UniProtKB/Swiss-Prot annotation:
A Pfam family reported for this protein in Swiss-Prot or TrEMBL: CLP_protease
Name by which UniProt lists this protein: ATP-dependent Clp protease proteolytic subunit
Listed SUPFAM superfamilies: ClpP/crotonase
Matching InterPro entries: ClpP, ClpP/crotonase-like_dom_sf, ClpP/TepA, ClpP_His_AS, ClpP_Ser_AS
NCBIfam families named among the record's database cross-references: PRK00277.1, PRK12553.1
Length: 209
């Protein structure tokens, strides 16, 4: 069975622009990158993480002061891959605005709440889900014990990140993340994961630019 993401990428439309040197064709995502828009779409894994981090670093080099917009629709995925994106978002100089369209689950929700304060959004029908990390291991008992200790440390670190970005106390975060916890956009706003639920673009802000 073919990878559905690969199938979709083969159908990515091209955008043709007229320049003083003639016509130039971009795939739609490259054209949006010119507008400082990055998509985090699908499972978070090493390949996606590499591409997102590279785009963040490129946009910082292009303009270290101008805001970057990250659109998220992700079920989550590998913790270390997500942490690479998170650390890069915090490392670069431009503020990163985040917006959830569809869903931001697991690591997707962490990336959503990691956006610049006041610039974390969700569309009205978006779904956000938070939970603790999970994993499965096999091998010697001593190795399994070490893996268990490591995942507990990772759980603690993820809780601390949610505390930092939501303003909630540690015990509340730990209780909330103990099981899969689903939220509507409005509930995510009330919890502190996002700053605003947006139904339409702010036309006045666009016109003032």
């Amino acid at each position: 069975m073919r990878d559905p993401i690969e199938t979709v990428m083969n159908l990515v439309p091209m955008v043709v622009e007229q320049t003083n040197r003639g016509e130039r064709a971009y795939d739609i995502f490259s054209r949006l990158l010119k507008e400082r828009i990055i998509f985090v779409n699908g499972p978070v894994e090493d390949g996606m993480s590499m591409l997102v981090c590279a785009q963040l670093l490129f946009l910082e080099a292009e303009n270290p002061k101008k805001e970057i917009n990250m659109y998220i629709n992700s079920p989550g995925g590998v913790v270390t891959s997500g942490m690479a994106i998170y650390d890069t978002m915090q490392f670069i100089r431009p503020p990163v605005s985040t917006l959830c369209m569809g869903q931001a689950a697991s690591m997707g929700s962490l990336l959503l709440t990691a956006g610049a304060t006041g610039h974390r959004y969700a569309l009205p029908n978006a779904r956000i889900m938070v939970h603790q990390p999970s994993g499965g291991f096999q091998g010697q008992a001593s190795d399994i014990e070490r893996h268990a200790q490591d995942i507990i440390k990772m759980k603690r670190r993820l809780n601390e990140i949610y505390v930092k970005h939501t303003g909630r106390d540690y015990d509340t975060i730990e209780r909330t993340l103990d099981r899969d916890h689903f939220m509507t956009a409005q509930e995510a706003l009330e919890f502190g994961l996002i700053d605003k639920v947006v139904e339409a673009r702010d036309v006045s802000a666009d016109e003032s630019k």
